[in-house]
UniProtKB/Swiss-Prot annotation:
GO CC, alphabetical: ribonucleoprotein complex; ribosome
Pfam families: PSRP-3_Ycf65
Keyword Iron-sulfur attached: no
Family matches, as Gene3D superfamilies: 3.30.390.140
Source organism of this protein record: Crocosphaera subtropica (strain ATCC 51142 / BH68) (Cyanothece sp. (strain ATCC 51142))
Family the UniProt entry places it in: Belongs to the chloroplast-specific ribosomal protein cS23 family.
Segments traversing the membrane: none
Name recorded for this polypeptide: Probable small ribosomal subunit protein cS23
Function: Probably a ribosomal protein or a ribosome-associated protein.
Length: 112
């Protein structure tokens, strides 16, 4: 499993999940519960919708999530979306495995 963990935090509380597709990238967050996880958000798709803004709104609605955790999650989501978009703008295709190696703290799934 891959985790978003704040510095000094004993146990990670959230996992950023990415659905890596040719025409879209989708992001979601799971909450770590014990030794497992539970979905915290739906998947938000880019560029079909503004995935980053939708994720931000969803996280802000959960008042028990610390601001530092929200920022960490959103910063990582920004990196992943920008990476996918930059590759697409250059006409390049990258496998999910390559994306996973660039972002080892993120959990990827997809069709390639």
């Amino acid at each position: 499993m891959s985790f978003i963990q704040l510095e000094g935090q004993l146990e990670p509380r959230f996992i950023l999940k990415v659905l890596w597709l040719d025409a879209n990238v989708a992001i979601a967050v799971d909450q770590v519960v014990g030794k497992g996880t539970s979905p915290l958000t739906a998947y938000f798709f880019w560029p079909r919708n503004d995935a980053w803004q939708e994720l931000k709104d969803e996280l802000e609605a959960k008042h028990w999530i610390l601001e530092t955790e929200r920022i960490e999650i959103l910063n990582k989501a920004t990196e992943v979306i920008n990476y996918w978009q930059d590759l697409r703008n250059q006409g390049k295709s990258i496998t999910m495995k390559e994306a996973q190696s660039k972002f080892p703290e993120v959990t990827f799934s997809g069709s390639n």
